[in-house]
Amino acid sequence: MIKPLIRPGITFLKSTSEYQWLLPKKSFFNFEKDVYTCMCISHIPPEGSTYGINVLESIENDVILYRDKGHIILCGDMNARTRCEKDYIENDSNDGINVYDNYSPDFSISDWVNEDKTLCDRGKQLLDMCISYRMRIVNGRTVGDSTGKFTCYMYNGNSTIDYFIFSECLFNDILSFHVNDVFPKLSDHSKISLRLAASVNLVENKVQMTEFPCNFIWKKDSEESYKKAFQSDLIKDKIKNLCIDIETPDIDT
């Protein structure tokens, strides 16, 4: 799942059957802060399910734990329909009202668009979490997804339930976001992909590589040359020495 090239820069954190927390280290990717990333790796049970755990609530508790240590990214199938409701406090300001001295108003950000016009209770819960912890939905808001494409295609209708959600401070580092074409034979969900600006510190490979011999081009007279080569004393001696090496056990004494 993680390319070997960047694996040294990734730390695995909390894991459940529904999601996996990862930590891409700031020292490896040259981020301003560590980026705590939650990947929803399985389908979150729908509303009304008898499954006893509120997965979004569990993720929110983790966000509370990690948010003061770095930035947050959530991604994957949230099974939450959010229409295109606000995920930030509109016209937020600390002017003219009594607020804490260290209060910082929400960043000004463009509204997002969404082909899905339905809002469900879990969608409201997800939006509340975004507002509470200054996280913003990437879908329908960046280069690559100007229309807010559906991400799930079912027999009873299409929906947008797969997301990338970023700490608002990270938004300027997003290069593009894409909802890829769906392949019904593989999944009823579209793959979502995102490009994030980073500068990876790669360790130079100092292993001495053996030079590979040049390719031999076979010609009409090559067969005869091949036979003559095996008749030469030089080649006979090399083959003899090789056979001796193979038959002699390598034992330390």
Placement of each model-derived feature along the sequence:
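Short coil/turn segments at secondary-structure boundaries
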Residues: 12-15, 51-55, 85-89, 177-179, ...
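Metal-dependent phosphoesterases centered on the DNase I-like endonuclease/exonuclease/phosphatase
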Residues: 55-161, 166, 233, 237-240, ...
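Active-site beta-loop-alpha junctions of metal-dependent nucleic acid enzymes
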Residues: 15-20, 44-58
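Eukaryotic short linear interaction motifs
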Residues: 7-9, 29-32, 46-49, 81-84, ...
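Structured beta-strand-rich core segments of catalytic domains in phosphoester-bond hydrolases
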Residues: 1-42, 180
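Active-site metal-binding loops of divalent metal-dependent hydrolases
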Residues: 42-44, 77-78
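Surface polyanion/phosphate-binding segment centered on an Asp-His-Pro turn
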Residues: 23-37, 73-74, 96-97, 156-253
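Beta-strand elements of modular eukaryotic interaction domains
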Residues: 9-13, 23-29, 62-65, 127, ...
